[in-house]
Curated annotation (Swiss-Prot):
Cofactor entry: Mg(2+)
PTM description: Activated by phosphorylation.
Organism, scientific name: Streptococcus thermophilus (strain CNRZ 1066)
CDD domains to which the protein is assigned, alphabetical: GlmM (cd05802)
Encoding gene, per UniProt annotation: glmM
Example of a GO MF term: magnesium ion binding
Protein name from the UniProt record: Phosphoglucosamine mutase
Length: 450
């Protein structure tokens, strides 16, 4: 991570931290960096989610791109993975998504994709940051024919929708409940599932610029759970603001999280001989029950740090085609290069059709262990050294011995705050409370600030 770019681009409160002035500079400097690494005039796709600040930041960003001669294709409201798909398939130099994903409406973000559809690499981001930190903007200022051109490209949305439909199966009137989070999937999710011959019930499809992720979507699935029960739907599908993640709901109204979704799709691919190296890439936060279910099926695991960025890195490095996070980011590399909630939803319904099983039957193969997470405030300098404290190392070792393999402890530093996170999983709530509270008490006594 750099000074401006985090693990998911540049984020901040719109018009406060992430200002139009900064958006202009990101467009101008980002466009210039792109132009230095290819011949000819770069072609860049730009899209946004439904936040009220989206058009403001889009206008500034586009102005910056045009000021250095970039050919800009404006996609309007589109899911983040839609940008990734179009960049790859339409030979663009790069893509830019304006979104803060599952964050509330007051936030926004700007994320760059390279011409390969993957998030821009660290080296390119560092070049942009160096220009942002320069004392003076000394970049060329072309005029007349040297300026960039702007093309409105709303047909990009339909191209992305058509692609998604080709990855699925006719659902034969299956009842599907959708929650589009009042975000980027507000139009596309409806279109896609109608094209797949589903009978749909929809919430979260009335964005007003302020209601994105507000009580709806993958981080607030309660309304979708109720809708599934009321409508008698076979499945509920909740996306987030930019539709790069999915949380599902079974026909009984119970949550099917990213771990279970990955297991269901992974087992299906494994049985067909289509799971690359018979391996699923996951993070340290995936539930122990997920790991045990994979072991039972003979499916391998590759485990990374928290963050879809690290999952994708591992997939690219070793040629894996399925990975993701408990939070609902699922990457299916055979189809797209980033987490894609709508694509994942389609693959989940495909498994239901081909197996003839309900979602609850498929999900029941994974027994999720109760999990508890406690954040403890510590000095920033100590959060990476906690395991060097003898008393902390000793209590963790003692608790792990008591678990005897039927539980899991994870103590890790926050990547962004002066916090130490203590997490445990165990067969019962009482056990998990005991393990976490015991470790947390020792951590607080040794290095805690509260």
């Amino acid at each position: 991570m750099g000074k401006y770019f985090g693990t998911d681009g540049v984020r901040g409160e719109a018009n406060v931290g992430l200002t139009p002035e900064l958006a202009f500079k990101l467009g101008r400097f980002g466009g210039y960096v792109l132009s230095q690494h290819e011949t000819g005039r770069p072609k860049v796709f730009v899209a946004r989610d439904t936040r009220i600040s989206g058009e403001m930041l889009e206008s500034a960003l586009v102005a910056g791109l045009l000021s250095v001669g970039i050919e800009v294709y404006k996609l309007g409201v589109l899911a983040t993975p839609g940008v990734s798909y179009l960049v790859r398939t339409e030979n663009a130099s790069a893509g830019v998504m304006i979104s803060a994903s599952h964050n509330p409406a007051l936030d926004n973000g700007i994320k760059f994709f390279g011409g390969d559809g993957f998030k821009l690499d660290d080296a390119r981001e560092a070049e942009i940051e160096a220009l942002l930190d320069a004392a003076e903007d000394t970049l060329p200022r072309p005029s007349a024919e040297g300026l960039g051109t702007l093309v409105d490209y709303p047909e990009g949305l339909r191209k992305y929708e058509k692609f998604l439909v080709t990855t699925g199966l006719d659902l034969g009137g299956m009842k599907v409940a959708l929650d589009a989070a009042n975000g980027a999937a507000a139009v596309s999710a409806r279109n896609i599932f109608l094209d797949l011959n589903a009978e749909i019930a929809v919430i979260g499809d009335q964005p007003d610029g302020l209601n994105i992720n507000a009580g709806v979507g993958s981080t607030h699935p309660e309304q979708l759970q109720a809708l599934v029960r009321e409508s008698g739907s076979a499945i509920g599908l909740a996306f987030d603001g930019d539709s790069d993640r999915l949380i599902a709901v079974d026909e009984n109204g119970d949550i099917v999280d990213g771990d279970k979704v990955m297991y269901i799709i992974g087992k299906y691919l494994s049985q067909k001989g289509e799971l690359a190296k018979n391996t699923i890439v996951t993070t340290v936060m995936s539930n122990l029950g997920f790991h045990k279910a994979l072991d039972r099926e003979g499916i391998n695991k590759a485990v990374t740090a928290v963050g879809d960025r690290y999952v994708v890195e591992e997939m690219r490095k070793n040629g894996y085609n399925l990975g993701g996070e408990q939070s609902g980011h699922v990457i299916i590399m055979d189809y797209n290069t980033t987490g894609d909630g709508q694509l994942t939803a389609i693959q989940l319904t495909k498994v239901m059709v081909e197996t003839g099983k309900s979602l609850s039957e498929l999900a029941a193969e994974v027994t999720i262990y109760p999990q508890k997470l406690v954040n403890i405030r510590v000095e920033n300098s100590m959060k990476d050294k906690a395991m060097d404290v003898p008393a902390i190392a000793a209590i963790i070792e003692k608790m792990e011995a008591e678990m005897a393999g039927n539980g899991r402890i994870l103590v890790r530093p926050s990547g962004t705050e002066p916090l130490l996170r203590v997490m445990a999983e165990a067969p019962t709530d009482d056990e998990v409370n005991y393990y976490v509270d015991t470790i947390a008490d020792v951590v607080r006594a040794e290095i805690g600030l509260d």
